[in-house]
């Protein structure tokens, strides 16, 4: 019989309490004194009573958005100083409390270990691939281990530290793979990045926090909470994934191959949501590529088009958000939210952010126009800080890039993918990240 030595204190630590997502969702509703929620939009059955709306004439029940440049006391923000010292903190507080949740003040230290280094070729470019694990200090609660999975790839022939684009990477179950890119879509995005002389990194969000409500007593949230259920303003998975990206950037600041001042963040779909949350909260990230992020990402919460607030308030997706967000799918409505996603984009200012969407066929759920309008709504903040906005308030034709300013937008003709927008993003990003 083999015996395994446990860390000091582990023998006295109870195993994580197992709750289903439905049970955890219900206990959060109980904390909030909510007895019922409105159903989310049904994207699969057009005849359902709660079928997703795709009629633009019905898409704007609340056309008036919160003004990002008006303080809570009603005074207008007329200077960058007042934005940074007063208005921006107000917006951050609202997102913390009501939308994404608060990161605890004392999160555990992460110690990075290089577990493997190989010399390879990606396409015809010699590269150095480093496999890394970020060991999260679990001495306060040894029953939960969190080890962040990160891979860094840099050009082997670089003569100086290079910019890096970090992606929140998908991991598919055995037997499933990411759908292949459409025919004629060009080089894989990694090879396009390498062609610029830059590096890329892939962070696995599930190694930081599970993508389900049952996992809230595991991962970094479960570790910090010592298995106890979340409070209504505790962080959800999107903030946890963003926290993981920030810890990866901590490592890049020590990595000689990387210019940590020129690190971008990219993500698609739920990881597009995580990418813009990362950009908004960590000002060290130089640039963002936010692809098909939809509701909970760059899409306006006040839009009735495709996925809506009620979807994220339900038991399938609530774990992405703060518990308090559930209120807006039940007793409160979208217009009661103190903020909207144009202010999330504004939190990225003055740094450049690229909002990406696909065509109606294949990507209608994420509401391309709702994301465009959020980019428009962030424009006044960018201009206040001396940067360029989108340059128009009119939704452009498909495949028309709006890339003259620090807020950029393009709707490609593909489906739910970032792929067709990579060349446009990289050309635009070169203005800010420069060469290797």
Label for each model-derived stretch:
Residues 11-101:
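N-terminal pre-domain segments of enzymes
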Residues 5-7:
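N-terminal signal peptide c-region/cleavage motif recognized by signal peptidases
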Residues 349-368, 412-414:
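Conserved strand-to-loop "acid loop" that flanks and positions the catalytic carboxylate
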Residues 160-261, 294-303:
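Cap/lid segment of the alpha/beta-hydrolase catalytic domain
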Residues 220, 287-344, 367-394:
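Mobile cap/lid helix-loop segments that gate and shape the active-site cleft of serine hydrolases
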């Amino acid at each position: 019989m083999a015996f395994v030595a446990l860390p000091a204190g582990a023998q006295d630590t109870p195993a994580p309490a197992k709750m289903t997502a439905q049970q955890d969702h219900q206990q959060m509703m109980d904390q909030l004194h909510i007895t019922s929620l409105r159903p989310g939009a049904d994207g699969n059955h057009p005849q359902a009573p709660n079928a997703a709306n795709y009629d633009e004439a019905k898409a704007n029940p609340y056309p008036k958005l919160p003004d990002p440049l008006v303080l809570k006391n009603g005074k207008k923000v007329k200077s960058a100083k007042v934005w940074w010292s007063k208005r921006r903190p107000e917006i951050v507080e609202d997102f913390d409390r009501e939308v994404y949740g608060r990161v605890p003040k004392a999160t555990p230290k992460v110690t990075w270990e290089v577990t493997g280094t190989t010399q390879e070729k990606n396409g015809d470019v010699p590269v150095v691939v480093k496999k890394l694990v970020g060991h999260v200090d679990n001495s306060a609660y040894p029953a939960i281990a969190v080890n962040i999975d990160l891979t860094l790839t840099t050009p082997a022939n670089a003569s100086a530290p290079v910019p890096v684009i970090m992606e929140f990477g998908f991991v598919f179950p055995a037997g499933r793979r990411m759908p292949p890119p459409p025919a004629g879509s060009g080089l894989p995005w990694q090879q396009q990045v390498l062609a610029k002389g830059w590096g890329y990194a892939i962070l696995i969000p599930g190694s930081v926090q599970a993508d389900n409500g049952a996992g809230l007593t595991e991962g970094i949230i479960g570790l910090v909470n010592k298995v106890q259920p979340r409070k209504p303003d505790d962080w959800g998975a999107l903030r946890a994934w963003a926290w993981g990206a920030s810890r990866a950037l901590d490592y890049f600041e020590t990595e000689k191959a990387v210019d940590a001042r020129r690190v971008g963040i990219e993500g698609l779909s739920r990881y597009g949501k995580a990418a813009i949350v990362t950009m908004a909260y960590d000002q060290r990230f130089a640039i963002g590529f936010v692809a098909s992020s939809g509701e909970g990402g760059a899409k306006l919460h006040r839009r009735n088009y495709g996925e809506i607030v009620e979807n994220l308030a339900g038991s399938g997706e609530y774990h992405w958000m703060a518990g308090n967000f559930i209120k807006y799918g039940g007793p409160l409505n979208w217009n009661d939210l103190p903020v909207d996603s144009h202010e999330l984009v504004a939190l990225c200012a003055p740094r450049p952010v690229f909002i990406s969407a696909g065509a109606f066929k294949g990507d209608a759920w994420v509401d391309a126009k709702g994301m465009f309008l959020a980019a428009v709504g962030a424009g006044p903040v960018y201009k206040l800080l001396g940067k360029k906005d989108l340059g128009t308030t009119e939704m452009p034709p498909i495949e028309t890039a709006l890339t003259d300013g620090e807020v950029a937008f393009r709707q490609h003709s593909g489906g739910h993918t970032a792929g067709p927008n990579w060349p446009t993003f990289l050309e635009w990003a070169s203005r800010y990240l420069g060469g290797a």
